[in-house]
Amino acid sequence: PNMTTVESTQCYAAALDFLAQRYSDPDMRIAHWIIHNEVDGGIHWTNMGDKPIATFMDTYLRSMRMCYNIVHQYDQHSEVFISFSHGWNIAAGGGWYKVRDMLDLMNQFSKAEGDFFWSLACHSYPAQLGNPCTWDDAQATFSMDTEYVTLKNLEVLDKWVGISQNQYKGNIRRSVWLSEAGTCSPSYEDKDLQDQAAGFAYGWKKINALDGINGIQWHSWFDHLGDGVPLGLRKYSDEEYKGEAKPVWTTY
């Protein structure tokens, strides 16, 4: 959003207030507010253009803090999340930022201006989207300097939120949701379908064992042509495949 004028800022605040008020009922509630999409790819997903990372994060933090303050008027238990791709210490796309640098700035800015409870929404796809065997991700290591964070090395996120300097007020762990994740089946051949299920099972065992990872949301219910790779739990919902369940459906 444009946070540089009073009018545009008030319009954004009004939209947030409308949503927060409408969806704060026990029967119809937004509990998790993910602020924008894959902000490390802000040059593609927002309207700011190619900006220095500090300029981008200053605007982003104001957007997130505004959402936090407004929704907490209606629901003290709601959470706001910074959304990022599977890049960590590498720009995951042309003109993108490094996620670790963005999180460092989040810490610096929020503590300087007053800390608040923001959380992490990670898109922990395999480093190569077309390869469901995430354990083969050579660029995903267990070092805090790893290039990518995927289902292979979720321990990096778990360790990051366990460090006191990254915690809310120094002692409260921030939430981590894998808010858009999944493995693909490169084809509908049996081996590819089994590899997709195995890739998820591999990741799930890690999620289940790591206290710092709260949960996972799968990318897509069905395969979709617009995704580039078949990431669904079920096959294409066309006349040929009719949304037939893939092995990963049962695993999930």
Indicate residue ranges for each PLM-predicted region.
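Short alpha-helical functional segments enriched in proximate histidine and acidic residues
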Residues: 22, 70, 206
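Glycine-rich, acidic and aromatic/proline-enriched surface loops and short helix-turn segments
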Residues: 22-25, 163
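Glycine-rich anion/phosphate-binding loops
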Residues: 5-20
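Glycine-centered flexibility motif
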Residues: 5, 83, 182, 231-234
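Aromatic-rich peripheral "rim/lid" segments of glycoside hydrolase catalytic domains that contact
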Residues: 1, 11, 25-29, 34, ...
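A generic structural signal for solvent-exposed, polar alpha-helical segments
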Residues: 18, 39, 102, 131, ...
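Noncatalytic carbohydrate-binding groove/subsite architecture in carbohydrate-active enzymes
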Residues: 9-13, 29-31, 55-190
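Outer-membrane beta-barrel translocator domains and adjoining extracellular loop/strand segments
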Residues: 46-47, 134
